[in-house]
Amino acid sequence: ARGDLGADFPQLKVRGSVLRTSPVDAGPMAAVNGRNFTCRRRADGGYTVSQFGASMADVVPDSFRLMRHFLRSWMANRDFVRLRFGKRFFEELGIPRHFPMDRASPFERHRVLDPRPSARGIEQAWRRLVHAFPAFRDARIQQSWAGYIDVTPDAMPVMDAVPRLPGLYLASGFSGHGFGIGPAAGEAMAQLIQGQAPAIDLHPFRYGRYGS
């Protein structure tokens, strides 16, 4: 959304919850992407598990400001994203959108994003995992955590210079694909910033594709 620099960028965030199990000897060796859960074996013999299609989207002021960009995407993916209205709306309502440079910015006051995992999502993922693989019945949940995923209306990142702000380059909105395309994206952005021709075509990731 439009911030203190006056640059428009339609981006929201969803919260994903994950758990880690104790080691399981007879568990699957390959990564599993099931109908309602995913799991992947870890180097310590345990598994990282999440519930498929259970990302949580907090309804915040930007949800309304950016509705025209995101409505079609949400309608197409409403079975995979849960909406939640709670205190996060009022917390973000109090964040100033313009702030003087001689005061602490909202980014300085909120340095760490460490959201609480969804207890319901963790319990459902665990129950479905045990149902599919009985070998997990004697395992334990050793840790659970959550994180925010930045998303754009078309689930593709923006990797481009911001035309109205010379020297500002944007690489954001990877929509959950950051680990997969991050290395190539980093190389392409480094080339772009240095004035070189990127090794990949960045036109599909241009800043202005949302009408910005």
What is each PLM-predicted segment?
Residues 1-96, 108-119, 124-132, 136, ...:
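Flavin-dependent oxidoreductases
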Residues 10, 140, 156:
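C-terminal active-site/capping subdomain that shapes the small-molecule cofactor and substrate pocket
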Residues 13, 51, 143-145, 172-173:
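Active-site proximal loops enriched in glycine and acidic residues that flank catalytic Cys/His/Asp
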Residues 31, 150-151:
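A short catalytic or substrate-binding loop motif that flags glycine-/basic-rich loops and adjacent residues
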Residues 53, 103, 161-163:
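Short, small-residue-rich loop/turn micro-motifs
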Residues 101-107:
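Short, basic/glycine-rich phosphate-binding loops at helix/coil junctions
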Residues 135, 145, 151-212:
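C-terminal lid/capping helical subdomain adjacent to the catalytic/cofactor pocket in oxidative enzymes
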